[in-house]
Amino acid sequence: MSMNWTRRDLLKTVGLTTAVGAGMVACAPAEPEGGGSGEGGAATAFHGAWPYMAAPEGHFNFAAQPYAGVPTVILGDGPYRDLLVPPSALWLWKDKKWEYLLAESHELDASGGTLTVKIKPDLTWSDGSALTSQDFLTTFYVQFIQRAASWDFITGLEAPDDTTVVVNFENPPAVLERYVLKSNILSTAQYGEWGDRAKAIVEAGGSMDEGDGEKLGTDFQAFKPENVIVSGPYDFDYDTITNTQLTLVRNKTGYGADKVTFDNLVMYNGETTEITSLVQSGDVDYATHGFAPASEKPFESAGYTILRPPVYSGPALYLNQDRFPEFADVRTRKAFAYLLDRATIGQIALAESGKAVVNMVGFSDNFVDDWLTDEVKGKIEKYELDLKKATSLLEEAGWTKEGDAWKTPEGKAAAYEIQFPQTYADWSAAGKNVAEQFGEFGISVTARGLDDKQAPIDVDKGDFEMAMQAWGSSTHPHPHFSFVQDLFVHNIPIAKNQGGKGYGFPLQDVETSAGTVDLEKIVTESGEGLDVEDQKKNVSVAALAFNELLPIIPLFERYGNNPALEGVRVQGFPKDGDPILENAPYADNFVVLKMFRGEITPVEG
């Protein structure tokens, strides 16, 4: 199957999304109502924040999370999703091991070509039905509808009994374990019909790009259930959902309900501007937004600690290479990399939490020493600020300059628009500075902020000139996931789900100094094999190809500046030096994990 699937947030993955109405009121949050018995009779509440769209734009189709989800699902693109529909396990980034949730164990048999997951017994859904292996099969077949990358490895699915799932594969994939264990499991009662339709296509040898697959994909994008059947310790209190906040209430029969310590989780809706005021007023206990550097001292004065976990990703400059032939010329992209001062962009966006990308290989600088040999690192071009090189490359590509202004190879005035999610304070500041730097160089770029839910959709449809979207991935340390974000999520393979080509960089028959390559194949191979040394070779090929071609231009690597309010309503946030702080906040979130452990608790008294 060709690798065609849809985003995040990230990651996404990788980032924050919302559509906050112009009239949102965030300065006076409503007091949450009680939703549980509590130890002392009074309900306890944790106050978090995450951007979402209320109905009708927002919905409860939690399918194919976290790697190929449907856009605008309420809380579906963030860490609190795991408290509603838990995955099999969460990954401990420092310890490099799994902490099981729904799963009891797992085993990868390379010679037999199977990944077997044993499910904890006696798990139940909020509708009263048992959670079984059939729900896992449904989940994976629904991922096929969303063109999830896992289906480049999966060759079959089996459920020998109610608590055993077997995933079959051909080439042992290093990353399949992550795709399987991190999948948020869906209820067959809610998604069984969709899973059956996908299974029929799989068994017939079909794809999502033809016949029944195309119709199924179209139908599924329109599936917007009124609620979600959950298996985790919390469920939505649907009556509380407004444009400003919602409440999650304890699901007493869900997995982890015996360990989580809060009766309610109050989630305030909003992007950075709205949530900043709520942090300053002490209404939020923890938030992961990209806060403006100027906010940090007021937060600390209000009693907050600033947590700075690595995010392992950040914003990149996307160029519409399908629409503008000058952007399709690698010399132009290299010139842009040389002319942009990435350190300044990161400093303006996030101060010490915005670190300029150094190696420009498509994945976090934190992992370069783990995956690339000294020989490979010696081949990397770091694209350090060099306006002379930028000028030379543009001239070589046919650009000309009249006075202080550049013209494209076609003789047109070099004038573009860069779009970015307006409500992301860090990306907004970065986008404006990118426009200023281009202007100082003689290329006119107009900055335009968009609704942050619409911005990635516009990129997928090709309705942009320049744009800020994510590079890298918070989903797992393995570089494969970063390459998927860089090359597939807003490019031809996955943008297809929105009917476009994204930034329009072809992945097949790509010319490099090493010869003609198939980047889609290279990315897939970067996740194959169980021998680490073999994986390093594949990762090196992908890293060098990215570094030479710069399909997108990474700008800075983001570190969290997450305010945590210890000792008022909540206690148990990790301290500096705690290895759990190496967990990516948008993937295996340390606060969510500590909630499952019962280590984030209400303040007594």
Please provide the spans of the model-predicted regions.
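Aromatic- and charge-enriched surface segment that lines or borders ligand/interaction sites
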Residues: 104-147, 160-168, 326-328
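Surface-exposed binding/hinge segments that line
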Residues: 151-213
